[in-house]
Amino acid sequence: MQNQVIQLGNIEIGNNKPFVLFGGMNVLESRDMAMQVCEKYVEVTQKLGVPYIFKASFDKANRSSIHSYRGPGMEEGLKIFQELKETFGVKVITDVHEIYQCRPVAEVVDIIQLPAFLARQTDLVEAMARTGAVINVKKPQFLSPGQIGNIVEKIAECGNNKVILCDRGTNFGYDNLVVDMLGFNIMKKVSQGCPVIFDVTHSLQCRDPFGAASGGRRDQVTELARSGMAIGLAGLFLESHPNPNQAKCDGPSALPLSKLEPFVAQMKAIDDLVKSFEEIDTSN
């Protein structure tokens, strides 16, 4: 199978390359907490030799409740991202929700993310693609893996072939998500080998059907992440928090920051093992 590789500074993102950790916070809660979380990720990934990209949102525009915290906004968020880049030398990924956000965000961060709920909005997809930035496409929960190729084609038609695909679970009835492990391979095939990554923490969301916020199953984050890494992926997308029970968004799915090092060590061991195997073609 063809495997495309995206070069981002000294980081190679590809399905047959050592996995990249896309890690950080769900949403920027404060400048100080962002610094704390990023510093921990840098410490752990440098110790373990894992390529690292910081992730967080400056605005959670799709919160269920009008009363839920959304973030500091684009202007303040970009200032925080710039400080993280200058302080720690990290690459940064964040999401956009409006066309007007695309260019100013792409001028600061290294990867712009297309949210799952917006992944079929052609005008937004085209505006993102025309920035020339690397695009991370979150597969919508309502879309089959095979349909992701249409989104990749929209981006390619704008002259941008720097695309990462991210699975964050698929609707399983009402208010629940499951991860189809066969879907990762389908996404690789229909995209002609785009790097595929796994958002393990969002895949653990589960909703109270009458509640105003998502629940989660962070007690299962290690098991689900192990399963995904055994496929052979370009990266893992992970959210952590110093105190998940106090997080302003998606705390029930977040990995406690104190558990980051043993968690990443296990993921690296699985990735190293799986990618040491020779690929077996069982198609004929």
From Swiss-Prot:
Its EC number is 2.5.1.55. GO terms for biological process: keto-3-deoxy-D-manno-octulosonic acid biosynthetic process. GO terms for molecular function: 3-deoxy-8-phosphooctulonate synthase activity. The keyword Repressor does not apply. The keyword Iron does not apply. Its main location: cytoplasm. It catalyses: D-arabinose 5-phosphate + phosphoenolpyruvate + H2O = 3-deoxy-alpha-D-manno-2-octulosonate-8-phosphate + phosphate. GO terms for cellular component: cytoplasm. Gene3D superfamilies: Aldolase class I. This is 2-dehydro-3-deoxyphosphooctonate aldolase. It comes from Histophilus somni (strain 2336) (Haemophilus somnus). The lineage of its organism: Bacteria, Pseudomonadati, Pseudomonadota, Gammaproteobacteria, Pasteurellales.
